[in-house]
């Protein structure tokens, strides 16, 4: 039919920009199974371009030329630091090079980095994509700084990563918190309910943006499409912290991703579920954002010596996800669901999932997140976390007061899942305690009295933590991971929060953010009357 029907042949040849062979390939492979939809046309066209990895290819060409380096870095392809070569390998160290014309420059990309960013934008369905080498922390901060100026209001949930509040300290914007509902059993914050977002928007019509977590660390998703629609109706931008959502762009039957929901900007941790090297990330922008201005904001804080190891890993990982991501994340979801069922069969644990969805505070759930409630066996999540590492050589992502999180991704195997399940069964058998002895604690939403910037730079004094109730905090206090502040600058310290911090320390949570490494003292504002209205 394609060869004989001139009209049909003309249509598909035009659709594939004159590439007759590609058109024939599409007709033969796709139509019998999927139909000739515009979406399938786009998929096969993108698959062709997505096979490229411009930064990686440029590095390979450079290596073939055997260039003699009289530039930095000073290890000179590893020759000046043999121990580094022994640790990382000759090829890795030889590709740790500086910016040069054939390799482009991240601060002002015009060739291979520009091409790689364009391919990333295409793969993630964004208008523009930026390679970020300072982690998603720098991506989130650049996103907020691009939108907010001193005195601007931004609507956001309190359970944001510390990078968001750090950005408010830098730019002087004012947080308007939509405090999500807290699950009293699990002790975690849930998603932003659309009614609460609407209330915050109506009460703060001058706010410039709404920021959303998609998903949270624990897999909870808000109704992102409705939030975007509501914010845009009130001429506000929508920023999405998608640090834990790379896979949402490629997997099937997963929660909606930021760009598909119509969000204006999204920070995506490629190194978490996307397979790139630690510290590599993406910042995505939509059509409503001036990406040239965003580029200027990024360059205020981004290094001028960007790592080509990180950038090439972003390039290669994007290619891998674009070509094989759908199948990869189907397997990831299957492994996570299998693990969830097996862990729940042990008894005592609660591996939560889609059963939490209620259409409101839990609008959707990311099934790739293996979040497990542990207090049912009388152990805090951090205690199970430590036992798995110290006694079973299993390193999981997170342990808090009530939960653990095992991160399942494209590098996991079913035998690894079996080992984790077996270890959890063993932990219950050997180490379980009476749950009645557990302190009943949950995440507490603090009251903001002073803007983060004003509090951070205010005159402060150091006090023993047990004596700080009623004072205004002048620094961050958090468990890491997840890096969500228990207290941030400008928030009221209460007896309940003090109890939470002390209990988390006693259970072994890794505390950080305070000037005092032991977290025995807190910096508080000297002038308690300095209340921001």
What is the role of each PLM region?
Residues 21, 41-111:
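N-terminal "arm"/small-domain region of PLP-dependent enzymes with the aminotransferase-like
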Residues 93-138:
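Conserved N-terminal alpha-helix of the aminotransferase class I/II PLP-enzyme fold
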Residues 128-153, 167:
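Conserved beta-loop-alpha segment that forms the PLP phosphate-binding cup at the N-terminus of a helix
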Residues 151-212:
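PLP-dependent aminotransferase-like
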Residues 186-247:
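Active-site phosphate-binding strand-loop segment of PLP-dependent enzymes
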Residues 257-296, 302-313:
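Active-site PLP attachment segment
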Residues 317-340, 416:
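Structural signature of PLP-dependent enzymes
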Residues 338-513:
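Conserved C-terminal alpha-helix-loop-beta "cap" of PLP-dependent enzymes
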């Amino acid at each position: 039919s394609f060869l004989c029907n001139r009209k049909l042949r003309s249509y598909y040849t035009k659709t594939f920009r004159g590439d007759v062979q590609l058109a024939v390939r599409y007709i033969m492979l796709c139509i019998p199974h999927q139909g000739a939809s515009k979406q399938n046309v786009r998929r096969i066209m993108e698959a062709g371009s997505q096979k490229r990895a411009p930064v990686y290819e440029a590095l390979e060409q450079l290596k073939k030329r055997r260039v003699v380096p009289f530039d930095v870095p000073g290890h000179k392809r590893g020759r000046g630091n043999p121990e580094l070569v022994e640790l990382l390998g000759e090829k890795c160290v030889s590709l740790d090079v500086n910016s040069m014309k054939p390799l482009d420059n991240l601060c002002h990309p015009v060739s291979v980095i520009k091409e790689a960013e364009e391919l990333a934008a295409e793969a993630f369905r964004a208008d523009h994509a930026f390679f970020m080498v300072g982690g998603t922390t720098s991506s989130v901060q650049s996103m907020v700084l691009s939108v907010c100026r001193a005195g601007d209001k931004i609507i956001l949930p309190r359970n944001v990563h510390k990078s968001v509040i750090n950005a408010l300290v830098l730019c002087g914007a004012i947080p308007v918190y939509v405090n999500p509902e807290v699950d009293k059993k699990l002790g975690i914050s849930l998603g932003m309910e659309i009614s609460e977002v609407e209330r915050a928007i109506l009460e703060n019509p001058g706010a410039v943006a709404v920021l959303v977590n998609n998903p949270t660390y624990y897999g909870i998703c808000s109704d992102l499409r409705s939030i975007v629609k509501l914010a845009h109706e009130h001429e506000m931008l929508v920023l999405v912290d998608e640090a834990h959502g790379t896979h949402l762009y490629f997997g099937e039957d997963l929660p909606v991703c930021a760009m598909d929901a119509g969000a204006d900007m999204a920070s995506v941790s490629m190194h978490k579920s996307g397979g790139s090297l630690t510290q590599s990330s993406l910042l995505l922008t939509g059509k409503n954002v001036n990406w040239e201005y965003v580029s200027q904001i990024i360059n205020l804080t981004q290094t001028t010596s960007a790592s080509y190891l990180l950038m090439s890993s972003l390039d290669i990982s994007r290619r891998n996800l674009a070509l094989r991501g759908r199948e990869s994340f189907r397997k990831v979801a299957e492994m996570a669901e299998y693990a969830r069922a097996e862990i729940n069969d042990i008894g005592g644990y609660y591996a939560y999932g889609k059963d939490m969805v209620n259409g409101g505070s839990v609008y959707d759930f990311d099934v790739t997140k293996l979040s497990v409630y542990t207090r049912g066996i009388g152990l805090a999540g951090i205690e199970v976390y430590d036992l798995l590492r110290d006694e079973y050589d299993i390193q999981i992502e997170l342990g808090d007061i009530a939960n653990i999180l095992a991160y399942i991704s494209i590098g996991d195997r079913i035998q690894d899942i079996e080992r984790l399940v077996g270890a959890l069964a063993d932990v219950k058998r050997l180490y379980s305690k009476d749950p009645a002895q557990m302190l009943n604690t949950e995440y507490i939403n603090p009251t903001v009295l002073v803007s983060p910037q004003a509090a951070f730079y205010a005159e402060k004094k150091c006090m023993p933590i047990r004596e700080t109730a009623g004072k205004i905090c002048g620094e961050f206090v958090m468990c890491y991971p997840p890096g969500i502040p228990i207290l941030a600058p400008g928030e009221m310290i209460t007896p309940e929060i003090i109890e939470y911090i002390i209990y988390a320390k006693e259970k072994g949570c890794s505390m950080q953010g305070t000037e005092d490494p032991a977290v025995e003292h807190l910096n508080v504002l000297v002038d308690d009357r300095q209340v921001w209205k």
